[in-house]
């Protein structure tokens, strides 16, 4: 017998209150934040898996409910129609959430099975027909598609996080292959960097170069090979010199003409914030810590000043973009103990969870309870990042609870 949505939410609420699966609190005690957030991460993750999964292909749909007439705007040229399964970028979002959940001991056994499935899914995007080998935007079994350097950076990060979680050498090998593909796009125009996608030389964006920086640094983290540290520093230095704006945040791209495109998204600063923290940890050079702390402050101030609803701490330009910024705040907290930025994003996320979920338990794009948004299909990436955020918050709160 299928539970009604209202009753299902009631059951979920009981599980949170009781601390089910996350440590039973003593009678009369409220559950600890780490347990609440882990429960929400589990619920979000399982909801995505149940609703978006396309069993025939072992992949996921772009939206739920699936609406194949939808037009996707995040590809070169725009106006691409929704297809049978999702593009690589939203698929990667679920892989990233899995990697974070793997860090929680109680979730490891279950998440290893999900990881196996996601690795198989990731490989359907791998294109071996062109040289060098890289990952294209849509599974090769359906069509030939563009190969984006930022997508490949995400694949590299996902595989390195999976390697750091499991020490499976296959994942390390694949991350190295991805990084070789990214380096094939590096040239000395505009002083270095890579473009957005293979064969298009109109811009060098923060998204491609920021994710390349992190891929290199995570490869160094896993191998201690100075080759990857040197490349991480090279990408970082190019970004810092070429795309850091006078506002203190990172601009979207530099055009082939050399003109700076002063459009600002949260994730472009987030990737560089995490990179600065990693460089500080790897080198001990305090300039990186200083740059990280300044970027954390400037990014929060900048996006808090942008128009946004009162319940949100900053402008939610895209939930996944904010998730990448949160990764940077998370990394910085672990080296300097400054929790203020994490706390403010957490408060916004909690508002979205409590007020802005639709009849299927899926969160709106703006994190606000807008009736039109509540009625619309929800994008896979917007939901996968909710699971990642709550998994990260659960880990952070668990550490804070043990220190009290």
Tell what function each PLM region has.
Residues 206-212, 216-220, 227-276:
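Active-site cradle of extracellular carbohydrate-active enzymes
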Residues 112-222, 226-233:
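Extended ligand-binding groove/face enriched in aromatic
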Residues 1-31:
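Bacterial Sec-dependent N-terminal signal peptides
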Residues 102, 106, 163-167, 220-224, ...:
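Short coil/turn linking the two alpha-helices of tandem helical-hairpin repeats
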Residues 31-97, 101-113, 117-150, 204, ...:
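CBM-like carbohydrate-recognition segments
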Residues 183-184, 221, 240-241, 281, ...:
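Amphipathic alpha-helical segments of tetratricopeptide repeats
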Residues 268-283, 288-304:
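Oxyanion-binding "anion nests"
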């Amino acid at each position: 017998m299928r539970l009604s949505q209202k009753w299902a939410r009631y059951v979920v609420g009981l599980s949170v209150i009781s601390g089910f699966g996350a440590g039973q609190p003593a009678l009369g005690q409220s559950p600890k934040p780490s347990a609440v957030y882990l429960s929400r991460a589990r619920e979000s993750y399982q909801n995505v898996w149940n609703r978006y999964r396309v069993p025939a292909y072992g992949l996921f749909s772009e939206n739920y409910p699936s609406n194949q007439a939808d037009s996707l705007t995040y590809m070169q040229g725009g106006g691409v129609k929704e297809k049978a399964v999702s593009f690589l970028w939203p698929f990667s979002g679920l892989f990233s959430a899995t990697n974070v959940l793997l860090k929680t001991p109680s979730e490891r056994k279950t998440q290893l099975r999900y990881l196996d499935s996601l690795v198989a899914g990731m490989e359907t995007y791998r294109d071996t027909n062109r040289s060098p080998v890289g990952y294209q935007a849509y599974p090769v079994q359906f069509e030939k598609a563009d190969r984006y350097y930022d997508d490949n950076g995400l694949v590299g990060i996902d595989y390195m996080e999976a390697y750091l979680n499991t020490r499976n050498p296959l994942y390390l090998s694949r991350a190295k292959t991805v990084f070789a593909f990214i380096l094939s796009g590096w040239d000395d125009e505009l002083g270095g960097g890579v473009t957005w996608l293979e064969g298009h030389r109109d811009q060098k964006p923060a998204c491609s170069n920021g994710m390349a920086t992190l891929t290199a640094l995570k490869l160094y983290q896993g191998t201690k090979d100075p080759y990857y540290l040197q490349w991480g520093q090279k990408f970082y230095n190019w970004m810092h010199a070429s795309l850091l704006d006078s506002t203190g945040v990172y601009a979207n791209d530099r055009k082939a003409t050399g003109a700076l495109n002063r459009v600002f998204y949260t994730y472009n600063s987030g990737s560089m914030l995490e990179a600065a923290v990693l460089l500080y940890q790897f080198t001990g050079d305090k300039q990186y810590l200083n740059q990280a702390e300044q970027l954390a402050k400037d990014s929060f101030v900048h996006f808090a000043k942008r128009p946004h609803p009162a319940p949100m701490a900053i402008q939610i330009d895209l939930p996944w973009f904010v998730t990448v910024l949160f990764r940077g705040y998370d990394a910085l907290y672990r080296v300097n103990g400054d929790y203020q930025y994490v706390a403010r994003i957490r408060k916004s996320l909690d508002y979205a969870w409590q007020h802005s979920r639709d009849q299927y338990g899926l969160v709106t794009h703006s994190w606000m309870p807008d009736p039109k948004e509540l009625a619309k299909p929800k994008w896979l990436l917007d939901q996968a990042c909710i699971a990642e955020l709550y998994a990260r918050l659960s880990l952070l709160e668990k550490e804070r609870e043990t220190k009290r």
